[in-house]
């Protein structure tokens, strides 16, 4: 019977006085240690130590991991190389590892994932910054920037202050048509754009024409007044 299947608690004896020889057979081959499960915060506190036999078990100071090909150690920021692991057999012995058997990683490689993750967070922050909605009440009215758009992308209606309207009315009283040089001067003085000054004067001229037409239609003609005065 192989030593892997020998149970030390099984009450048995060998004939011809070979009981002393049974104690000399090692339970595990050289180079392998028994795997023990220690109680952790995730398990019960009263766990019994159990021994298991497997062709590939490695016991480390921080973490114990069982596998068929390779074992890894977490906590020391290094891993075992698959090429350095020798295939274990019941009759063979494991290969002892030194410092040269570890794959060391530089801090740049270790924190590479953290850098990528922080970059994604920064990109999301910039996207939210540029895609944030701008409401009409958040826009600055009567600014020299000029164009103000509404909710649906249309140009909003320009509102003028009382001071701006008064100055424009004064200018319209003296000059119904402005040169470009004068238009630029008024725009700079009232903190408006040249386009806004031009549109205001166009609308004001249309209003003035409508008012004059209404006045001429209500007043009697000059010929009728002369006839009445001659009679």
Curated annotation (Swiss-Prot):
An example Gene Ontology biological process: anterior/posterior pattern specification
One MF annotation (Gene Ontology) recorded for this entry: RNA polymerase II cis-regulatory region sequence-specific DNA binding
Localization per Swiss-Prot or TrEMBL: Nucleus
Residue ranges, annotated region (Disordered): 212-231
Primary subcellular site in the record, as a coarse category: nucleus
Source superkingdom: Eukaryota
DNA-binding region, residues: 153-212
Summary of the function given for this chain in its UniProt record: Sequence-specific transcription factor which is part of a developmental regulatory system that provides cells with specific positional identities on the anterior-posterior axis.
Protein name: Homeobox protein Hox-A6
Organism: Gallus gallus (Chicken)
Name of the gene: HOXA6
